[in-house]
Amino acid sequence: MTRTATIVLLLAIATSAAPARAQTPAPLTVGSVTASAGEKVSGYIEVPAGVDSATRIPVTVVRGARAGPTLALIAGTHGYETQPIIALQRVRRALDPAALAGTVVLVHIANPPSYFGRTIYYSPVDGKNLNRVYPGRADGTVSERIAFAITREVIEKADYIVDLHAGDGNESLRPYAYWTPLGGDARVDSLQREMILAFGHDLIVVDTTRPKDLASSVYTTNTALLLGKPAITTENGYLGESAEPMIRRNVDGVFRLMRWLRMVPGAVPMPRRVTWLHRFEVLRSPETGTWHPLVERAQLVREGALLGYLTDVFGDGRTDIRASFAGEVLYVVATPPMSRGEPLAMIGAPR
């Protein structure tokens, strides 16, 4: 062997024996925010004016120093569901990009018009429910444009998505989550299920009725699922209050999920006993008037149990509302104003 060939061979051996360098994540841009590896950057997704006013969605991108999945956390889809919003502020402060594998995209308030307008369910600008207009429209009303922006800037750029909900300003709600398998991708359905357990939920509504057409996906997480991305909807909080146990529950759930995804170190103990609710019903008001609830969240009720009653604005004309099957009260509207067709309570049962 010639001296030159020997040198080439030794260099090849040395190169193959050297440890591979960890891949540095490329910068990620969400709206006006660009974060490079090891950075935490906050800013906005601008939603331009259209048929109505403009708005801007506050976001933070935490780009880990090491490669890993991209997890999107969305709070404030309904503006008065406040506990997840406060929780993501705490998550933002706690996240250290130097210790993170992957990226966390935090959508702090998905629905600023509703949050600052202090409205339940609907935007004060266009009267629409943001979680009923996905995947949105670039030329639609403000709620539709918000949904379009979140679909393009957040959902399409993420690997995993969590839509963090709570009881709205009028809803007294006990913690639960939704598992919504679409049946088209067993991998996604299974990962969605595991994400819920990793988050820490032990009471899970099983809903197999979600739309299967991406053009009319309706819901935030359903949009992600139809794009082949595991996504879950969690419910932790009630009545728009700054309830510390519910804020902590949201924060803890996020970090449990991040450990499960191996974005941060640590073990994830799964819930020991899980109840899957295959039967559920949202009872809706047959009339506009005043609601008098007689049950509380997490209360067990029998079939035919009196959940509350409606009267007119003078207190006359009582209409009783009863449970159509035995189960648990997942939430009950705890405030008097009631419009025809709006939710009164939700009941769930295993079968």
Regions found by a protein language model. Give the residues of each.
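Bacterial N-terminal signal peptides
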Residues: 5-16
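Structured catalytic-domain cores with a bias toward divalent-metal coordination
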Residues: 2, 21-351
